[in-house]
Regions:
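A structural preference for long, well-packed, hydrophobic secondary-structure segments
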Residues: 10, 44-45, 82
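N-terminal Rossmann-like NAD(P) cofactor-binding module of classical short-chain dehydrogenase/reductase
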Residues: 59-60
């Protein structure tokens, strides 16, 4: 099973991807990143990508464009691919 971090998890597309992943046995969202957390996700949500310490195979990005620099810095440091 692929373990993914959902970057931008509380946006419209982040929620669509989270719901699709919940119904798919081949992928698991293990953490979310979003500055706004209303507590409705089935996984922990962090306000900053740098707060996340959960191992993952991939980061799925549907966050705002302004978040891309921190995302890519984190992904390079952790050697995690981003899609």
């Amino acid at each position: 099973m692929v373990k993914a971090i959902m970057h931008g998890c509380n946006g419209k597309m982040g929620q669509v991807i989270s719901n699709l992943a919940a119904a798919d046995s081949d992928i698991e969202i293990v953490a979310g990143i979003d500055p706004h957390d209303d507590g409705h996700n089935a996984y922990p949500v962090y306000r900053s990508i740098f707060e996340c310490d959960i191992p993952a195979d991939v980061i799925i990005d549907f966050a705002a464009a302004g978040a891309v620099n921190n995302l890519l810095d984190y992904a390079v440091r952790k050697n995690i691919p981003v899609v």
